[in-house]
Amino acid sequence: MNDDIEPGLRRRIRQDVQSMHAYAIQESTGMVKLDAMENPHRLPADLQEALGRRLGALALNRYPGSRIDTLRAALAGHAGLPEGFSLMLGNGSDELISLLAMACDVPGASILAPLPGFVMYAMSAQLQGLAFHGVDLTPDFELDEAAMSAAIRAHRPAITYLAYPNNPTA
């Protein structure tokens, strides 16, 4: 954090959070941003217009209410989830990763993931005060199954991320 922060605010923010660095967004002019799952092409004009009409007809000034249950059930059916299982929906992967870390924030808990990988795995662990254990991919950016298994046995993490292929290696 910046040294210009008001002293009263500095006392309220954990030291480990103050020492964190901002998420760096690399210059990408002229590049296809595969690491951010962005489509380099705009939607066709007719589709943009149709989506605009549909979005304009929605009651965006209200919470979804029971409509979220209908959406969740439809998505679970489409994914073929077994009875008794559910989906967790959120505003993007950062929010879902943070919520999982928050839910598992108990003394001694940790998070484990392959490296390099999605930066939010380690960042969410740090923000929640959880230990993060990274396991290096092989030199060919393949999952090192033996190293992952050994790390899981050694650390017994509350969360093990296996997003593979992952961001930014695939």
Where are these regions (language model features)?
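Conserved core of the PLP fold type I
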Residues: 59-170
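N-terminal small-domain helix-loop-helix segment of the aminotransferase-like
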Residues: 2-94, 99
